């Protein structure tokens, strides 16, 4: 993050604008909306600024910039067509530790103006850090079409009710749940219809009904790593959570999407290394929910595919706590897709089998005879530790030693690492594989060299297109 987003209170604060042309006028009109006390340093004013001056909207010094003009001002904006003068304004501001903006000359700016969506008191600011202003404008236009016009009045009413809600609901978590329900329920629906009086009545009724004290648990699949693969429902629950218990397999990019003030607890597991025993995780889920909290159990991939999600929900259900499950893209689907390996193919594989290489009791309970049959794909989770045994057993039971295999490390992440080879060399590949890693066995692996795409093309352009097309 190159620039820290800040919202400045400019009401009755002096702001110096150097320049009296149309560019300065556009900045001044924006400053006026924020209530700034505007001072203009320029020998002449364009018609638009002269009109504002006559209406009492600005003070005009009527002379060229002098450093002394920076005394006792809050911000300074240079908006002239004289590059040397603009640079001088910036340098003088820097010497006085004042924030300065030089229009269309980012190197001389200590702050920049974002693209703005105004639904006052809701304001959305979008910035490309000065690198792609056209992209920022396109994003603003897209969001303008998505964000409803009633957001401003709804926020104003919510602000007027904050004091009453705080008096009636003492806990911060309780107040947050009240507002989440109101802003996603009847109150918001009435606001959308323009029925302001009825909307306030709905707030009154909700407040009189009292806060909801019951906690709940949401078991959410975080997907294989790329935050773009997270489901919308999962994101919504992560943004509403009071506390999030997450595993090591959840990527930092996904964790970054958790609500900022939610408590985060690492309940991670790696092979041979458990930061928290499974029974303790089960107990903690129940305890936190019984405290009235919204708990998200965030697990890599899909929580019901080798994620012990079923075990955890058994404990939650036994305690009588409400719960829900949000599926995630499992690693076998996500990692292979990003590696250009289709799990099934009419010419190579008519079935796919998911296998765990880490059995609960450590015993060999796999049907190797069935797994060694051809024309199927094997996706083995946590298989690198037992790669030698897997290779040996499959070959012993009839699978060709030349069967193509892949070991995919950090699948779907920017540092994804794919190794390919044959079944007889699986152990050597596994020894070089960073974890977490997925083992894929089958003829479909050979297609990796034809249709591998991730990291091979201009992904920056692809991702930008997906962001721009929000609607």
From Swiss-Prot:
Reactions listed under catalytic activity: uroporphyrinogen III + 2 S-adenosyl-L-methionine = precorrin-2 + 2 S-adenosyl-L-homocysteine + H(+); precorrin-2 + NAD(+) = sirohydrochlorin + NADH + 2 H(+); siroheme + 2 H(+) = sirohydrochlorin + Fe(2+)
Region of interest (Uroporphyrinogen-III C-methyltransferase), ranges: 215-471
Family annotation (Gene3D superfamilies): Cobalt-precorrin-4 Transmethylase, Domain 1 (3.40.1010.10), Methyltransferase, Cobalt-precorrin-4 Transmethylase, Domain 2 (3.30.950.10), NAD(P)-binding Rossmann-like Domain (3.40.50.720), Sirohaem synthase, dimerisation domain (1.10.8.210), Siroheme synthase, domain 2 (3.30.160.110)
Chain positions recorded as NAD(+) binding sites: 22-23, 43-44
SUPFAM superfamilies: NAD(P)-binding Rossmann-fold domains, Siroheme synthase middle domains-like, Tetrapyrrole methylase
Pathway: Cofactor biosynthesis; adenosylcobalamin biosynthesis; precorrin-2 from uroporphyrinogen III: step 1/1; Cofactor biosynthesis; adenosylcobalamin biosynthesis; sirohydrochlorin from precorrin-2: step 1/1; Porphyrin-containing compound metabolism; siroheme biosynthesis; precorrin-2 from uroporphyrinogen III: step 1/1; Porphyrin-containing compound metabolism; siroheme biosynthesis; siroheme from sirohydrochlorin: step 1/1
Active site: residue positions: 247, 269
Chain positions found as Phosphoserine: 128
Precorrin-2 dehydrogenase /sirohydrochlorin ferrochelatase: region residues: 1-203
Keyword NAD annotated: yes
HAMAP family in UniProt: Siroheme_synth
Record-given protein name: Siroheme synthase
Originating gene: cysG
